[in-house]
């Protein structure tokens, strides 16, 4: 459905019922699938035929939703995972192994920072972090001969730094590696990174795509634009025979879908992390209203950011929809109509203590370790999502001790502002 607008794709992509079939995407709640002959199963196990034989690898419900997300991003193929962290892990591990190196922007979600800095190190994969605002030359200086990936977020969580996608893509491609971008906060409604040079996109579908805080999931989408064969000496897992699958060469047999096919047939087979069909069904319900919700999230966030920016007890507001924000020009360039997301981060003049008093005084907004849900939620990143980071790492991630992250919901904006206003009196 490449010719349709995003609102139409959110409703119709991925699943097209035939005569007499359900209009709503069915939940295929089954682990296994029946075949009539032994040879039919052989063809599936040898990756010589398409089909389903075990839900840990593929499921019709899951695949329909993955196809929808791929279409929304403009990719050739996608896979769903059981969480956003699983998506980021698979996206990198699919093309990295012990002895390899990753370069990543420092202003990223705390869990992803730990994944790259700590967990991958245990697997023999090193990571060097660079400032998102660094020059191309400074980013390039972090690369090594064994660098396989450049990783960043379109909108950093929680610093709300807007990524200069073209700058990062240019450096990545000059060093013959793909740019992987986590597009969770922007969503394909507001930004499509492939149009600016990114090669692979990840999502925590738990956030805006779901929108109701009822399922945990992730997604990986491949643009199909990175030429793995051209750099086969680096990406031999894709360009050389896979001994665990009868010597299949993914790029030769699956072309532009090689990357996603390998992630499905190899990583899902060995590591699991597949979402349940019911979770994918719930995700699909969220996707159907994604454009409507994102528009309201952004409208409300803009009004609240303007209110906070003018309040005497607020020392600083991070929101690229504000003309005086450092990242306003990048938001105007990369984001649909300059809209970013429904998340605001800000700091009070009273610092950390004032932040705690403010948050504890809120009546409508919920203190919760979540973001991008329909209801307004708030947390203190240094104490919550980024608690495992030391002071130096917090500074690199753009997280100050007094920073507050506000995930603006789709309630009436006047009610949200009234709640914030009364809480500020106690800050």
Model-derived features: positions:
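N-terminal "arm"/small-domain region of PLP-dependent enzymes with the aminotransferase-like
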Residues: 1-59, 67
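Conserved PLP-enzyme active-site core in the AAT-like
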Residues: 7-16, 78-310, 318
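Conserved N-terminal alpha-helix of the aminotransferase class I/II PLP-enzyme fold
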Residues: 37-89, 111-119
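Glycine-centered tight turns that cap/initiate beta-strands
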Residues: 74, 146, 313-316, 364, ...
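PLP-dependent enzyme catalytic core of the Aspartate aminotransferase-like
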Residues: 117-118, 126-127, 145-148, 360, ...
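Conserved small-domain helix->loop->beta segment predominantly found in fold-type I
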Residues: 271-274, 278-280, 285, 289, ...
